[in-house]
């Protein structure tokens, strides 16, 4: 395993006792590790805690190895997975992803799983996203196809957050929630 990934996972494990169970975990690679999730969730005052357990450069195979430390030990009710962008050279990435989903289902049977499609385009992303889509049952495992382009990186983050925040909720959206999201 990559030493950087091992170090980051170890650091995350050390702070797991500061988390609340039954909340939301985002588990991803480079893109989500750089996503301003805390700034956007704080701005919208979401009712749930969101823990970003994304690690720059994380590949699916490594994600399986650190799953307990980064996700399972938190006991989330929802898990958002954004992996695959670093796996283009791994011919087994799709089967590893399937194994990751199965492991989460086994260890967290009550958790909802949301797979976030790759946003970088190209033939690998298209094929990988199709494989992810085939893992969905639309009950406990769902697929999210994020907006891929916008006028700026900030605008893109905001648009993607608006998409994701709909899945973060545990209660119906209110008018004040709508206005809060619209102001992003």
Protein language model regions, located:
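Serine-esterase "nucleophile elbow" of acetyl-processing enzymes
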Residues: 1-75
């Amino acid at each position: 395993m990559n030493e950087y990934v091992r170090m980051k996972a170890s650091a995350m494990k050390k702070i797991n006792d500061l988390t609340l169970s039954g909340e939301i975990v985002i588990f991803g690679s480079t893109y989500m590790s750089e996503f301003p999730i805390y700034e956007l969730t704080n701005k919208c005052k979401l009712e749930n805690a969101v823990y970003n357990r994304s690690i720059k450069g994380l590949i699916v195979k490594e994600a399986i190895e650190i799953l307990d430390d980064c996700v399972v030990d938190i006991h989330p009710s929802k898990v958002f997975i954004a992996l695959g962008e670093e796996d283009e050279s791994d011919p087994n990435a799709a089967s590893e992803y399937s194994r990751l989903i199965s492991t989460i289902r086994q260890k967290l049977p009550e958790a909802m799983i949301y797979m976030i499609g790759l946003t970088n385009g190209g033939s690998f992303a298209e094929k990988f996203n199709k494989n992810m889509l085939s893992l969905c049952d639309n009950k406990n495992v769902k697929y999210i196809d994020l907006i891929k382009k916008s006028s700026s990186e900030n605008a893109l983050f905001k648009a993607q957050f608006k998409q994701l925040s709909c899945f973060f909720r545990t209660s119906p959206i209110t008018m004040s929630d709508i206005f809060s999201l619209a102001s992003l």
